[in-house]
Amino acid sequence: MAKSPFLELSYDILLEISTYLDYKDIVHLSETCKSLSYVFDDKTIWHRFCARVQGLTNVVPVVDDNYKRPYAVWKDRGYAYSWGQQIRNYLGRVVNTNQYPRDRPGALTGKDVRSTIQVQVGGYGMYLLNENGNLYVTGVPNNVGPELMRDLEPIVKIHAGREFCLALGETGHLYQVSLKTRICLTDEQNMLSAYRGRIANFKSGWDSHSAYVPGIGFLVWHTGRESEAQLFQPEASMKEFVLNDYVHCAGFLVYTVASPQKKGAVFRLDLDQATQHTLGRELKRFASHDPHQGWHLAGSFETFTCLSDDGNTVYMGHANTKQVDDDPVIHDFLQNRGIKQLAHGDHHHLYLTSDHSIWSWGVELRYCGCLGLGSLHLQEQTSDPSIVSDPRTARNIVSIPHQIHFSGTCYSVAAGGWQSAALAISESVLPEVNVPPITTFSIIRPSRVPALRFLAAPATRTLERDG
């Protein structure tokens, strides 16, 4: 085969080569000469990098389609934050003292998670995916930070439920992972082996999990029964069915479809039916009143929400929202807010607005701190009727949203169980410090992840939640 000098390759071929290169390679080639700079500064390359980072283009302005700047800002100052219940190191933090309280957002500054592109919160910890496709998990007792999940191929997408996280590998394999288990669901002889490379979307739920395969339907399996997958087909004929978005809650799915005739329609599919041939049914009163507005779905445990494209309309539903004529819950405090994203834990809720602020409301059980508003039970009683601290049940109840303050610009939020997380850009995270080795019995384990640093912020109030 004849060899072709690199500089003589066509523009299209060089763009194709760029898909196999990482950030540093692209930067070095761009700085080599004007010809390569012209190619490797192409907006499609940098848009691809930005698109990998969950929510990044929500926060950093993109000027004249120049995605290079947002990505460079993220590389330099992007951090993952965590707050909430900290037992068994659920937050992945190195230190937890009065200076670094669990009820306020704290940045994870370990080098392995500094380049987090996706964060998911489960019931018993968090999952962080970095730009190299490495998946890290918190909740490891006696560990000093998030721990690498080994024996996985590079991962491109994750979703966490109560006990497990589903992870899609770059070769099309789908994995179900936790601290103690690694199952390749699409491996030969396993239940999803016929669908490797065909899975378009997947969700991990409360006690079951699902994968959507175009033209086939939803494949659903329960925790502990990973050898059995039930097929649920939302329509009698799947040939023309195109899924737009869906959420997997406790015992049911809520979904929207990519059809101009059904834009703005919301459907529910129950998973506890005697037969899996039950069709999805439209929740007619959840239909968007604006024919130009579709829905973005969020959901966890027993709650789901529908967020309009413009971020100004939010409909909420619950496990008991089953009938076709059931009304959505419409909170005035969620309307016309310019919301970019919603996230739900077991009993608490977060939303991110277009001005990059985070708001929270709901219930903190056992004063777990998942609202990120500080130690509400220790603060002086306020005249704000939306904040109630009940020492008899050790819970804080915040009935309307309150802003979470920290010195960072947030571009994505996540919630699950009694924990919360965010991805943000910050200029004021304190430098990393060395952590002394941790001794467990007679084994000495050196620290692998530098200390978390909490970003001090003025004391804040809270926002509320609904039942």
UniProtKB/Swiss-Prot annotation:
GO cellular component: cytoplasm; cytosol; nucleus; ubiquitin ligase complex
Keywords: Cytoplasm, Nucleus, Repeat, Ubl conjugation pathway
Organism superkingdom: Eukaryota
Keyword flag Protein biosynthesis: no
UniProt cross-references to PROSITE patterns, sorted A to Z: FBOX, RCC1_3
Cellular localisation: Cytoplasm; Nucleus
GO terms under biological process: SCF-dependent proteasomal ubiquitin-dependent protein catabolic process
Intrachain S-S bonds: none
SMART domains recorded: FBOX
Gene3D superfamilies hit by this protein: 1.20.1280.50, Regulator of chromosome condensation 1/beta-lactamase-inhibitor protein II (2.130.10.30)
Pfam families: F-box-like
UniProt keyword annotation of Electron transport present: no
GO molecular function terms noted in the UniProt entry: ubiquitin-like ligase-substrate adaptor activity
F-box domain: residues covered: 3-49
RCC1 repeat residues: 77-131, 302-354, 355-417
Subunit note: Interacts with skp1.
Name under which the protein is recorded: F-box protein pof9
Lineage of source species: Eukaryota, Fungi, Dikarya, Ascomycota, Taphrinomycotina
